[in-house]
């Protein structure tokens, strides 16, 4: 059985945007696991790992979340790790480094970069260098708008960069 792990800061992100994707993977025979914070119940998932990912890159509690996530990923034997939200994406991509060497694919969906034309300089100083480094740990970077797609293609280092209109999947990317 193929396995996918979704990672984000909070369960509400998945509840409001990704349940149809969970359902699709289940219908195709995949094991669907989720790692995130929050109490909301999530249908269509086999295992729910409650980890407390903080939104700030400087929050020291993210070190604990990273260690938990690394163990989940190492023990899970996932084919795909699909991460969302800035900190969920950062922690999952770092935690998955070893498994990528074994063939696990890491997807990151950028639901709008925090650095964009007209964004505060602080956003560029903090988030752009982080995403530049993280993109090198990304097999497929999924963007949802033209500005992010063009920027990512030109300046970031993901193996593959695609644009999806809104939230969803281009099924040709994952061959399920």
Predicted features along the sequence, with ranges:
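Helix-loop-beta element that forms the nucleotide-linked donor phosphate-binding surface
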Residues: 149-171
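N-terminal subdomain of nucleotide-sugar transferases
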Residues: 1-37, 76
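Active-site proximal beta-strand in glycosyltransferases
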Residues: 3-5, 97-116, 131, 142, ...
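Conserved small/polar residues in nucleotide/adenosyl-binding loops
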Residues: 174-176
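Short His-centered aromatic/hydrophobic patch
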Residues: 83-89, 110
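Conserved nucleotide-sugar phosphate-binding/catalytic loop shared by glycosyltransferases and other
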Residues: 27-64, 72, 160, 164-165
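A short beta-strand/loop micro-motif in the catalytic core of glycosyltransferases
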Residues: 81-82, 134-145
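Nucleotide-sugar donor phosphate/pyrophosphate-binding loop at the beta->alpha transition
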Residues: 15-17, 60-67, 105, 115-133, ...
